[in-house]
Amino acid sequence: MLPLGGATRKLLNMTTPALLTVPDREALKALYDDAIKQINPSRSAIDLTTGFYAETGNAVFDAGYLALSDYCKGSAGPRRLHVVSAPAGGGKTSYSYALMLAFTRYADQKPDAPYGCVFVVDQIKKADEAFKDLNALIPGKVAVWTVEHDRVCKKRTKVPQPAAEFTKDELRHYPIIIVTHAFYNGPTGNKAHIVVRDKRVYSGRALTVVDERPEEVVIHELTLKQAQDIREKLEEKRPDLKQVLDKLMLLMMPYTVNVSGGIVRASDQFGQEFVTDQLEWFTTMEAEGVLRDHRADIAALDQLFGFARAMTLGCAFAAPSGTVVQFVGWQSKLMVRPGTILLDATADLDGVSHICPWRQHVSIPQAHYGNLKIVHVPQHTRQRLSEYLKKAANQRAYVKWMVETIKEHMAPGERGLVVCKKALFDAERIPQWTDGDPRFKDPESYTGRYEWDIEGRKLCATHYGTGIGSNAWKDADVVFLFDEFFLPRWIAAATVQGLREQKANEGALALMKTVNSKAEAVDLIGEGHRLRWTKQMALRGRGRSYDQHGICGKQRLVISSELKSFMANVARLFPRANIRTAGVYTKTTRVALLIEILTNPDLPSKLTSKEISKLIEAKTGKRTPWRTVSSNVLTEEFGRALDAIGWRYVTGKGRGGSHFERTQQIIIQAA
């Protein structure tokens, strides 16, 4: 069993139930079906009992039953996570409610059955909503705890009027509890596992339902300059800590002049035993107290202390990024224990399942995105945005381009969601109000109430890094994704190590000489992160609703990203969506140029290689025989991109034998 924020050590002192009887599948399924019928009237827009939704319901039940079977095997139970990656808006949460209701009622009837459920959510607001829903269905048997649902909480910002108040210790008396990821994986997370049944205290709840992918690996990242700034501020407040901070700095300093440009580890030079001995203080309760007392007034103090703790475990490295050396550490916080299911719409895309055998997917129904109209537009700049957006002039230019794009692809009277980089929020560039506008003091107005107005267009805005799982914008007619959310490669590498519970001198990282060295697992996590955020945020609007055949609601998606990569993956992200390009692509690759050409809806259904050459010449002004292009573009990735826009390439013998022809899978929409 994995340690969960220290919870496992505390659970050893609790009573562990003897091997329990696996619930009778048919009896549990009957209770599950009854619970769905109880919930269904409150879901007026959909019918949970038929078609596409019913298939999702079967998937949730299958995952839940497998999880309970694992739990009943005790310590011999498989260490795995059963995953339901049904589409966003497909009813996963409603069915998880039905599962917890059915299981609780079954346990009430069967004294030898496993007992207790915990619903783990990513947001405080979501916890409050879940409590309202579940408590209405099974009154008196549900409890919730977040920092804002605590009885002694004095400052509430997420839920000013919580649906209920509890203490952590009261959770054990309720068969169903709702907590956040942060609490479940935190230092007192053991309280989520304790449950009282028939006046006896047990050490584990049988069923854990995790809503949305949790933070399975905590990353601690900083530069030497940041570390030195933090050290100076902390020494001003605590001069007695100079010696322990000096030890940390001495272990970091040698790697700031990384001549080789490679990955380095303090343990390789000094030995892990020496590093652990030098930094032992950072693992003490005293260090935790210092962090608690000063984290609010010293930015990134938790990053420095976290990196130091990671070094004591051999879970840290340094690597250059341009002219700056990045120091990276990690801590595994995997929610992998018998009896657990994960509800996450993009768990099939995020790369984790490809590198971690403990994820087990159940069969799910496939959504149809025929009502999703995608418009791909050129990027404002091909420079790295983390650097480009540091300058105020560039921020203004970027936002001006955003506004022009919104006006071009959205009609007055429509509602839209804008997703962009957090830097634009931090600088108060989004919305494009004047500096110091008092409306910035009410973020809910432009993040939730559509009070950002562009000539009659009603908009909300959010940034990458937040918003996954939110229903706040489900009435948006159009979603704008301005660029993508990339994971720095050094963080992707650390994430792989954390997911596999490996140290810096083990696994993929041990074989990498630099952060850019070839590593399939790192590639999968990096690409998976980007695809996950693209799909999750793209479907925050009307597209997240489905009919009984699994066809999504009518929505437009306007996306600015690297064209070749997007087209190569769009069929995986949004099967059967309607796609076109708009705008002028400059300095584009030949693959992207071909994609741009072939998205013209006025083209005939068949194009010979000679005709394609003429179209390329018309675009570029240069004579370009197909034979000089084909050897570079006819790749598997290009084939996926062709399929996504409704074309395929057919090889043939002789001049004019090879050609492009339309398929019937995708309908290219006219501009």
For the regions a protein language model found, what residue spans apply to each?
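ASCE RecA-like P-loop NTPase motor cores
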Residues: 3-671
